[in-house]
Amino acid sequence: MERKKAKIVAELQAVKHNSGKSYNQLAEETGLTNVYVAQLLRRQAQLNPQTAPLLRAALPDLPQDLVPEMMRPPLRSYDPNLIQDPTVYRLNEAVMHFGESIKEIINEEFGDGTMSAIDFYCSVDKIKGVDGKDRVVLTFDGKYLPHSEQKSEHMVSRTRPLGKQ
């Protein structure tokens, strides 16, 4: 399975490279975020049937036989060696360093809960800092999910026998 995914990803990356387009250009042409386009081309996200024609228009050399493959639920995995890449390592370091404070602010602003990584949008943007140097802006836009008190009376599997829904 991983081997097949690696082959498909290599093909998708070649199509993107040969197009000469950036993820930002593809995002603009498809109406998706730049990170989501990258996720699609790495088989980390599922291509929506309504989006397929937009992606095909943005990447005319995308082989037709890859489109149905991109519409299948992907195996969302990653190479464990990826952490050795300096950018990925620094992202992990930033989340670990600021994570506890971010969690505390989420709890303070919203209550006991978390940010969804399923109902989630992500983008990477470039801006100039006050010193005139380039800066990276990462936006994580996730739905707030409150934790719930686990009352037995609300546990459907206990109130209705399994198979008799």
From Swiss-Prot:
SUPFAM superfamilies per the UniProt record, alphabetical: Cyanase C-terminal domain, lambda repressor-like DNA-binding domains
Known catalytic reactions: cyanate + hydrogencarbonate + 3 H(+) = NH4(+) + 2 CO2
Active site: R90, E93, S116
Keyword Lyase: yes
InterPro entries xref list: Cyanase, Cyanate_lyase_C, Cyanate_lyase_C_sf, Lambda_DNA-bd_dom_sf
GO terms (BP aspect): cyanate metabolic process
Enzyme Commission (EC) number: 4.2.1.104
Keywords, sorted A to Z: Lyase
SMART domains associated with the record: Cyanate_lyase
Signal peptide stretch: none
GO molecular function, one term: DNA binding
Described purpose of this protein according to its UniProt entry: Catalyzes the reaction of cyanate with bicarbonate to produce ammonia and carbon dioxide.
Family: Belongs to the cyanase family.
Protein's UniProt name: Cyanate hydratase
Gene: CYN
